């Protein structure tokens, strides 16, 4: 028997290498039936627009609906697409044709619009926040000015000359910003050249221990301690030169306090209110005595 013998297809075995190519494709790539298209019949559509054509849609209408550019008046193949500026349908036709098939593209756009962040709302929120911060700064200025004017009344200096001569406690940068714009309204001082500071730090405001509760008595005591330590370290220096440097440092410190910029309005308001209530408590204690 010859090796190259042609075997007809109908004599091939239904399995193995001689199996049909169609069966191989069907086994490796199973095909599922396509979903059936469902249609909705409009009530009394034959009396309105369909006279000679039967109102039965076909599969060609599916492609028409998919290619629809947000038009709700052409839903079946028998309809004619008029121009937008010439077509003036009656309200009944518009309601019936819009109810036949929903406009899926419009609903998708509405969903995307809901998912996207509202840019106008965000811009409005930022504008409100900026306006609120501006109002807070204005309120801080008004409260600080009122507190400073109340502190300069004769009742504040009635306790004696000790309160006038003693420096104010170190409340931090917020108190410095309070006095910065109040002093300019009371007295106008000429600008003084700030001398060069020595290498040894003698400023009370530069040390963080000044704002602690145990160091809130006076700033003069800490400056005297620094001066004593400096004199002990430099025993061969002239005492008069040290006192002159100390006086210059004190003047530059007062000038720097008056030139400080405004800080956070919230911190300024809280500090002014705290001072105001402290003054009220002092007045009550004086009246009780």
From Swiss-Prot:
- A Pfam match is Mito_fiss_reg
What does the record say about its membrane topology? Answer: Peripheral membrane protein
Recorded GO cellular component terms are: mitochondrial outer membrane
Keywords, A to Z, come to: Membrane, Mitochondrion, Mitochondrion outer membrane, Phosphoprotein
Checking InterPro entries in the record gives: Mtfr1
How does it get modified after it is made? Phosphorylated by AMPK. Upon stress, phosphorylation at Ser-100 and Ser-235 by AMPK is sufficient to induce mitochondrial fragmentation.
Classify the source by domain of life: Eukaryota
Where does this polypeptide localize?
Mitochondrion outer membrane
Q: Which residues carry this modification: Phosphoserine?
A: 38, 100, 107, 221-222, 235, 258, 270
Role description:
Mitochondrial protein required for adaptation of miochondrial dynamics to metabolic changes. Regulates mitochondrial morphology at steady state and mediates AMPK-dependent stress-induced mitochondrial fragmentation via the control of OPA1 levels.
Q: What is this protein called?
A: Mitochondrial fission regulator 1-like
- What species is this protein from? Mus musculus (Mouse)
């Amino acid at each position: 028997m010859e090796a190259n013998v042609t075997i007809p297809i109908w004599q091939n075995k239904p399995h193995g290498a001689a199996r049909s190519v169609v069966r191989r494709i069907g086994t490796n790539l199973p095909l599922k039936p396509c979903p059936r298209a469902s249609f909705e019949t409009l009530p009394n559509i034959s009396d309105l627009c369909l006279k000679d054509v039967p109102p039965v849609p076909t599969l060609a209408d599916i492609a028409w609906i998919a290619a629809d550019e947000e038009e709700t008046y052409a839903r079946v193949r028998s309809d004619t697409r008029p121009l937008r500026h010439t077509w003036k349908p009656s309200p009944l036709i518009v309601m019936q044709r819009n109810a036949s098939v929903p406009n899926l593209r419009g609903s998708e756009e509405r969903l995307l619009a809901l998912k996207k962040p509202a840019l106008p709302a965000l811009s409005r929120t930022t504008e409100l926040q900026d306006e609120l911060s501006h109002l807070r700064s204005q309120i801080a200025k008004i409260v600080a000015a009122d507190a400073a004017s109340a502190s300069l009344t004769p009742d504040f200096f009635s306790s004696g000359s000790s309160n006038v001569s003693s420096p104010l406690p170190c409340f931090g940068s917020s108190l410095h910003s309070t006095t910065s714009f109040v002093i300019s309204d009371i007295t106008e001082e000429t600008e003084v050249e700030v001398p060069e500071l020595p290498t040894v730090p003698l400023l009370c405001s530069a040390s963080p221990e000044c704002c602690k509760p145990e160091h809130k008595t006076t700033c003069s005591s800490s400056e005297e301690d620094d001066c004593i330590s400096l004199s002990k370290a430099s025993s061969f220096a002239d005492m008069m030169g040290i006192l002159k440097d100390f006086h210059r440092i004190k003047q530059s410190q007062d000038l720097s306090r008056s030139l400080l910029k405004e800080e956070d309005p919230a911190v300024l308001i809280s500090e002014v209110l705290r001072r105001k209530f402290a003054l009220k408590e002092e007045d009550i204690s004086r009246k009780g005595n």
